[in-house]
Each structure stands twice: as structure tokens, then as C-alpha cells.
Amino acid sequence: MLALLWFAVPNASQARETLTWLLRDLPPSTLFAGTMQGQGAIDQLMPILTARMPEYDHVLMHVNRARAMQMLNDGAALSCDPTMLWTQERARTIIYSIPIFVLFSSGLIVRKEHLGRFEPFISQGQINLQALMASETVKLGVVAERSYGGLIDKTLDESDEQTLSLHYGSDAVGSLLQMARAGRLDGLLGFWFEVRYQALQQGIDPQELVFLPIADNPLYQLAYIGCSDTPEGKHAMQLINREMRTLRESALMGFYARWLDPEQQQSYLSDVKVIFDKQ
């Protein structure tokens, strides 16, 4: 089901083009329901960004990843997604913004009681995902059509499909965590801040889970806004880049930091400032 929300801009001229923002249910980046609805990092960014782009009528559409990719790729209407990782394949049909937000890289999340089955593949606190998947000894949950970064994506593409459980629906991360808790999965790939949030919502102590960084993966990943690669999309991206050069530091990185473990927040904010100064 698609949910539509319109953002009106006062005193703007008529006959403006509609810009549709494609939002997925990815707590705590976006929070579509519950007591903290609308308080996700991207939720808080959207009204600020859209208010600074009065050239458009802005529509927020709730979709899953598969539908978002379909709309971006076909380019029939001007659409943008504010929660994208860059991949070479996507860049053929999608235009990307400047980096808008820095994420701690995704990794493997397992229950602490099951850590032993992964130990042969762990060295210096990091897991060799390629060797793990080649062993065909575990079944991991992933969100269908989601990018986890180049190294992980390549490994998944080369893995036997029987070792993966792909989730296509809404609340994918929460559902995969439930499956792991029930013993139907050995673990799931994901971003720790998302899984930590879902664990708290499900009454799971995050201390019962272990986040394993992927060997040879960078500490951080860059996230972007992606728009349809059309003349209209290119024009919208010029305006998005203009605004996000300011908003990524003045607003968004703080919105994200509040969802991190408290001991990570200060180092994250310092690191992100250095990263953005180079971009």
C-alpha cells in the first residue's frame, strides 16, 4: 500500500512541478508509526529541505525498496529517494547527490548465544563474509534489493541463494530480527543503529546481540539522495545539492547521531565533519 503526504509551501505560484519523495520504512531513519512517528533522522530532514525548495509541490510517498527502484528507473515522473547508497549499477539510471549523510557501515548481526558457530570466520573482531557464505553453513536475512555497500553486495551476488532469506515487504529489518530470534535465521545483515532500534521495540536487550564488522569493509559508508536520471531530475538535483551542502552538517548529522549508542556519538560527529570537509 502506498501512503501519500503533501507538503504545501505558502505563497508559492501555481503550476509547479511535483517532486515525489520515495520513503521506505527504515526505523530510525524513517518512523512511520508508533510513539516516535516522524522523529527519524530523514523524517526530520524532509520538512526542512522541502521548505527550502519552493519551486516544487512536494509529495512524500511510502513505498518498499522494489517499488522505489522501479519508479526511479522508469523516470515517468520526477522522483527522488533520500536514503540511497551508491552502486555502479544504479548509477546507470539514477543521478546521485553529493554525500548527504555518513553511516556506520553495515555488518552481520547475530545472537550472542549463537556466536560460536561464526568463530571460525572471525579474526580481530571482524568476520570474513566471503568465507562464511562460501561455507554454506548458515542462512542470513537480507532486505531484498537493498545495497549494503560494494563489498557486501558483491559477496551476496556470488552466494548460493539457499544461504539467503530475502525480505521484500515493509518493516523488513524488524521482521528479519524476529526470524533470527525464532531460530529461522542464523543472523542478518544490516546497519547496527537500525537493528538496535528494532531490538528495543521488540523487547530484546541489545546486549543479547553481537554486531560483527565485515573484514575489509570501511568504518563508514556515504549515503545520498538519488533522483530519476532525466532533465527534470538533473535540475532538481542542482537545487538539492545547493541546500544539502548546508543541511547535512547543520541538521542531518545531528539527527542521525541521536540514534547511535551514546559512546559513539561524539567521535561520530567529529569524524563526519572531517569527511564532509573533504567532499
Regions found by a protein language model. Name each.
Residues 43-53, 110-126, 134-135, 139, ...:
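Extended ligand-binding regions for polar small-molecule ligands
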Residues 15-93:
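Extracytoplasmic small-molecule ligand-binding "clamshell" domains
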